[in-house]
Amino acid sequence: MKKIWLCIAVAVLTSGISGAEGLRKSVTWEKICAKPAPLPVSGKVRHVKSDLERASLWSVGSETLDRDFAIFDNYIGYMGETGVGYARLQSGWAKTEKKKGKYDFEWLDHQVDGLIGEGIHPWLCLCYGNPVYADTGHDLNAGIFPDGPIMDGWLKYVRQVVRRYKGKVTMYEVWNEPDGAKPANGVKGESWREYSNLFVRTAKVIREEDPDVKIAALAAFSFSNGYFKNSLEEIQRLGGIPYTDYVTYHAYWSIPERIVKRVEELQALCNSIDPRIKVLQGESGCPAQLEYGHAMHSIEWTEYSQAKWDLRHMMINFSLGCPSSVFTMVDLNYGWMLQSYGLIRMNLKSQPQYKRPKFYAIQNVTGIFTPEMSVDKDVRLSSCNCDVPMYVFGVKKNGNTAGTVLWQCGQKPSDSLERNLVDISLDGIRLSDPVYVDMLTGYVHELPKDNVKVTDKGTSIRLLPLWDCPVLIIERDMIDYTDEK
C-alpha cells in the first residue's frame, strides 16, 4: 500500500465570449494562474496533442451519447488538445437497433471515426438494454437480462458491433455499473450472478469476432459488499477468465485517497485469480458545483476543488499502476439536471462555454506522465515539519530516478489557493538540479539552491510550498517545458 505519511461555433455569437476558439474566459482559471506558488517561474509544462502512435496511460469520458445527453460535434474538436490516448464511448444498443435485426451504426461510426481523427483510440462500453425487446416484460434500461430472447438479440447485436469496429476499437467493456442494477431477486448489489453470465456470453462473442481486442469486466463501484469477488469467482466458474484482460472500477469519494486500500485489494484479488488481469480505473470525476443528484452530490464543490480532486485521483491511480479515465469531457444534460463534471462547461443547449481548470490540469498530466514514467518504490518521505497527512510517491523516467509527487491529503480538496511552506526530507532520491512543477497551473518553478541539500540518504528541501493538490519535484532535464510565463 502506498504510504500516506503523517507529517505536517455557435457559442461565439453569445455576448461576452472571446478568444480565437469562440470560448469564454474562465474566471476561475485566471485567478488560479494569478496566484502561483511563491517561487520564481521558469516556464510551463509542454502540452502534447493526442496521437494514435504515442502510448498513453490516460483516457477521457465521452459517454451518454447513446442517450443524446451531449452533442459530439460540439466538443470533438477540443478532445485532441487534452493529450489523452483513449476515450470511452457507450455503444447504445437501443439507439442502433430500433427494429429487431435492423442495425443503424451511422451515429456511432461518426464518433469512432471522429475520435480516431483526433488521434484518440476509442474504447467501447457495451450497454444498455433495448425496448424493442420489451415484450418479454423485462426492464430494459440498465437492468441485466438472463438467457432467453433478449440475450439472443443482445449477442447478435454485439457480434455486429465487434465485426464492424475490428481494428478501430481497442477494448470492449461489458456493461456499465451492473452493481447498481436490481437482479431477479430484487436485492440491489446482488446482480453478480446475472452479470457474470452476461459477461461470459458476451466476451465469447467478442473474442470470436476479434481475437486481439482487449475485454474489460465489471465497471463496478461497490467495494464493500463483495461484488468484485463474487463476480470474478462466478466468471471463473463459468470459464470466462481467459476472456478477461481488465477489471474496471469506478470511484467517487470526496477524499480520493480513500480508494487506495480498495484498489490494492482488488489488484490482489485479480492477481490471485490470474496475474494477467489488470485493474483499470474506468470512470471517475468530480462535479464543479453542489449537485442534487449523481455521484458525490450534496457536497459543496467548486471549479477549484474539482480540479484538485481530479488531479489527486489521477496521481493516485498512477501511483497504483492503474491506467485511468477521467469523467467526463463535457457537462451532460440529463433533462432533469445539467451535470457539472465536464472538462468543458456547457450550456443547456449542449454548447461549449469555457474550459474549466480541470481541462488544463489534465493537459499537464498527459504532458508529463507518459509510459516512460513509472513509480519509484525506493523513495519515501522521512521527515516533514507539518501536521497534516501527506501522499508521497517517487517517480522514474526511463528507469532512472527522476523525482517525487506529493500533496497534503486527508481532507476533501479545498477552494484555497494558499500554500504552506514546509521542510521535508526524502530518502531514496538524490536530486542534483530539481525544479518545482505545480500540476494545476503547469508552472515550472525554480527551487532556491540554498534550500536544497543532498544527503547520504536522499534530499532535504526547505520552505517547500505544498498544498492539497499534487506537486512534482523533478530533475530539470527530465521535464519538458516551455519558457512561457
Residue ranges and their predicted role:
Residues 22-160, 173, 179:
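N-terminal substrate-binding region of glycoside hydrolase catalytic domains
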Residues 446-485:
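C-terminal beta-strand-rich structural cap/linker in extracellular carbohydrate-active enzymes
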Residues 286-369, 376-389:
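Aromatic/acidic polysaccharide-binding cleft in carbohydrate-active enzymes
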Residues 56-62, 87-89, 122-126, 170-174, ...:
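Hydrophobic faces of well-ordered beta-strands that scaffold small-molecule active sites
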Residues 382-430, 470-472, 478:
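Carbohydrate-binding surface patches
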Residues 4-13:
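Sec-dependent N-terminal signal peptides
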Residues 135-246, 250-269, 290-310, 429:
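Active-site cleft segment of glycoside hydrolase catalytic domains centered on the general acid/base Glu
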Residues 425-445:
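Solvent-exposed beta-hairpin/edge-strand motifs
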